[in-house]
Amino acid sequence: MRILGIDPGLQTTGFGVVDIDGQQLRYVASGTIRTTSLALGDLPGRLKILFDGITELAARYQPDAAAVEIVFVNVNPQSTLLLGQARGACITALVASHLPVAEYTALQMKKAVVGHGRAAKSQVQEMVRRLLHLPALPGTDAADGLGLAITHAHVGPAMGRLGAATPLNRRQHAMYKGGRSY
C-alpha cells in the first residue's frame, strides 16, 4: 500500500510518500510545495499552487490513500482561517484524485511516530529518519508529511478492522464523484 502524507501550510506544505508491505515501511519521496513566489495577499493564487501541486503528486506517485494533518486552533484566528483554506485546497485535490483521505492531529502523529504526543519537531525528524532508514534528517515539513503517512500505515488498518470510518469514506467519495448514496 502506498500512502501520501500531507502537512498543509499556506506558505510551505510538506509531503511524504511511504510504501508499507506488512510491517515494512519503505521511503518513496518527500519534499515541500512552496507558494512563497506569490505575494502574501494573493490567496487564490497560493491555493491554486497547492491544489495543482497535490494533484501532481497524486498523479506521479499513485498513492492508495492519503493522510492530512488536522488544523489546530491558533492564538491568531486569521492564521487559523488561512491554514484551514490551505488544508481545504489540499483535501479537495486529493478527493478530486479519487483518494480516500484520513485526518490525524499533530498529537496523534507524534504519538504514532515518536511514542508521545508532545514530541519536539527534532524528535519527529529523527524517528522518521530511523523508521525509514534515511541517510539524513528530512526537513521539518517533509518529516511531518512522512510522519502522517507512517501514522496512517500503522493506525489506518486498525481503524478499518474496528469499523471506524475515515472522515471521507466511500459513500462520501461517491457523492463527490457525482453519485448519491444514502
Swiss-Prot record:
Residues annotated as binding Mg(2+) 1: D7, D141
The disulfide bridges present are none
Which amino acids does the record list as binding Mg(2+) 2?
Answer: E69
Magnesium as a keyword of this entry, yes or no, is: yes
One matching Pfam family is RuvC
- Cellular compartments annotated: Cytoplasm
Residues annotated as the enzyme's active site: D7, E69, D141
A GO molecular function term, named singly, is: crossover junction DNA endonuclease activity
Q: How is the cofactor bound?
A: Binds 2 Mg(2+) ion per subunit.
User: Which PROSITE patterns does this entry report, sorted A to Z?
Assistant: RUVC
Q: Please give the cofactor(s) recorded in the UniProt entry for this protein.
A: Mg(2+)
According to its UniProt entry, one GO biological process term is: DNA repair
Matches recorded under CDD domains: RuvC
Cite a GO CC annotation: cytoplasm
* Protein EC: 3.1.21.10
PANTHER family tied to this protein = CROSSOVER JUNCTION ENDODEOXYRIBONUCLEASE RUVC
- Subunit structure comment from the entry: Homodimer which binds Holliday junction (HJ) DNA. The HJ becomes 2-fold symmetrical on binding to RuvC with unstacked arms; it has a different conformation from HJ DNA in complex with RuvA. In the full resolvosome a probable DNA-RuvA(4)-RuvB(12)-RuvC(2) complex forms which resolves the HJ.
State the protein's name. Answer: Crossover junction endodeoxyribonuclease RuvC
Give the species this sequence originates from: Verminephrobacter eiseniae (strain EF01-2)
